[in-house]
Structure formats: C-alpha cells, structure tokens
C-alpha cells in the first residue's frame, strides 16, 4: 500500500517440495510463484522486496543457501514438527531463527537463549486447548484488518489468477491454525526489522547462535546414544 514506507529490503527464498498427492501444498507453491512474478516485476516494490521459489530443492542447493541466509523462518504450528535438522544448519551459519516453539526450535532457543531468536505463536498446550474448545479461524480473521486485506487480495487475484482454494482453506478449516498465529507472526517481523537496523545487536545475536550450535554436532549426538541407549563404552 505504501512502497515508500521505511522498510529494510528483503528477499524471501522458498525451497521445499510437496508430495505428489498433496494438493493444497501444490496450490501454495503455485501461489508463491505467482506472487513472486507479481512482486519481482513491480518497479515500485522490487527494490525492497523479492520472492524466489527454488525448484528441485536438495542438500546440494541448501549448501549454497544456508551460509548466505540471515534469517531462518521455521513457522510450523507448535506440536506438529518432527524436529528436523535444517534449522540447526542455519543456526551454525549464523542465521537467526524466526519461528514457533516447535521441533528443534525449542532446543535452539534453549541453547542460544530465547533473547537471541525471534519467537512467536502459541505454545503446544495452547494449541491443544484451542482444538478442544473448537477452533474457528474466522474469529481471528474478522478482528484483523491486515488478515482480511491479505485474504481479499488473494481472492481478487491478478493476471487471471486467483487463490480461492487457499483462502477458503484458511477461512474454513485452517488445520495448521495460520490465522491464530498470524498477528503474532507480524509482531515478530516488526521486531526483526527493528533489530536488523541495529547492526551491532544483530551481529551479537548471530554470533551467539554460532557459538552455541556445538550441541547439535554429530559427535555429541553419537556420544549421547552410546551412553544412554546403547550402553557402549567410550573407546579412546
């Protein structure tokens, strides 16, 4: 709405794959690609925002991306992520995690300190409680002008494209409670913008992530397994 607003230039890089039968995930990828086309070709926006979707994402490609990344967005709904290792690799390379307290994000925050990450969203007990009482995404959408504007924009579409299936999913079922966490996600993004402007503070956070990433080394993992699971003696 205001391309002249004070905004630190950002490039969002999406790299992932969807299972062949996961229709909604395919629609999300389509939406990201079309948004990228729109944003990257808009002269009023493209100097401050870029969107890139990388096809055929793999370990070899990630080896080029991770050393260059400054922020690692790990935004799964609390209680749904099976603790991957990608966020650990980003941490080792100095990226600051912007994410929920889910999966290995919990261990990263414990190791480096929550003050050195950008944490947002519900905790697992809050998610479970909301499921029990009944989750209604529209209750979060109706009171949020930004969420409404974003969904309406996707529904209107552009260049003959619209994303009704995506927005209908968010308005009706929203199984990953995106709308419940959306406002706090924006708060974390605002914190990111403020912190990034302070280069010394940002460098300090980045270095603390690197310095505390040793806990995720393979040597430590193997030692723990040998001691706690296999009961194998240490051989020097």
Where are these regions (language model features)?
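Long, K/E/R/D-enriched contiguous segments that form extended
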Residues: 1-63, 77, 231, 236
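Catalytic binding pocket for nucleotide-activated donors in carbohydrate/polymer assembly enzymes
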Residues: 67-69, 75-206, 210-215, 220, ...
């Amino acid at each position: 709405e205001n391309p002249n607003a004070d905004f630190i230039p950002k490039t969002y890089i999406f790299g992932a794959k969807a299972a062949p039968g996961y229709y909604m995930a395919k629609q999300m990828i389509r939406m990201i690609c079309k948004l990228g086309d729109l944003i990257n070709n808009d002269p009023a926006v493209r100097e401050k925002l870029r969107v890139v979707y990388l096809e055929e994402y793999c370990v070899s490609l990630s080896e080029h991306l991770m050393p260059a990344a400054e922020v690692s967005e790990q935004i799964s709904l609390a209680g749904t992520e099976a603790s991957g290792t990608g966020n650990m690799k980003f941490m080792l390379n100095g990226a600051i995690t912007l994410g929920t307290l889910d999966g290995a994000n919990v261990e990263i925050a414990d190791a480096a300190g929550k003050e050195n990450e950008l944490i947002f969203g519900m905790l697992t007990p809050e998610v479970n409680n909301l499921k029990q009482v009944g989750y209604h995404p529209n209750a979060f959408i109706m009171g949020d002008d930004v969420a409404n504007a974003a969904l309406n924009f996707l529904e209107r579409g552009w260049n003959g494209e619209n994303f009704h299936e995506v927005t209908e999913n968010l308005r009706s079922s929203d199984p990953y409670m995106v709308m419940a966490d959306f406002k706090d996600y924006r708060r974390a993004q605002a914190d990111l913008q403020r912190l990034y402007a302070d280069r010394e503070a940002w460098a300090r956070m980045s270095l603390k992530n690197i310095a505390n990433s040793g806990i995720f080394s393979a040597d430590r993992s193997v030692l723990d397994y040998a001691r706690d699971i296999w009961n194998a003696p240490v051989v020097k």
